[in-house]
Amino acid sequence: MTKGKRTFQPNNRRRARVHGFRLRMRTRAGRSIVSSRRRKGRRTLSA
């Protein structure tokens, strides 16, 4: 039985568009995510 291809195909532009900082700042929920990560002291806030 064959396995098939790997599902993770890295792409920096897509990564930024889907999980990036600008996208997080657009919505209220995203802003709360960033603020909670700031409070926790995360080194990276978003992708």
Swiss-Prot record:
GO terms for biological process: translation. One of its GO terms (cellular component) is ribosome. GO terms for molecular function: structural constituent of ribosome. InterPro entries: Ribosomal_bL34, Ribosomal_bL34_CS. It comes from Mycobacterium tuberculosis (strain ATCC 25177 / H37Ra). Belongs to the bacterial ribosomal protein bL34 family. HAMAP family: Ribosomal_bL34. PROSITE patterns: RIBOSOMAL_L34. Keywords: Ribonucleoprotein, Ribosomal protein. Pfam families: Ribosomal_L34 (PF00468). The keyword Ribonucleoprotein applies. This is Large ribosomal subunit protein bL34.
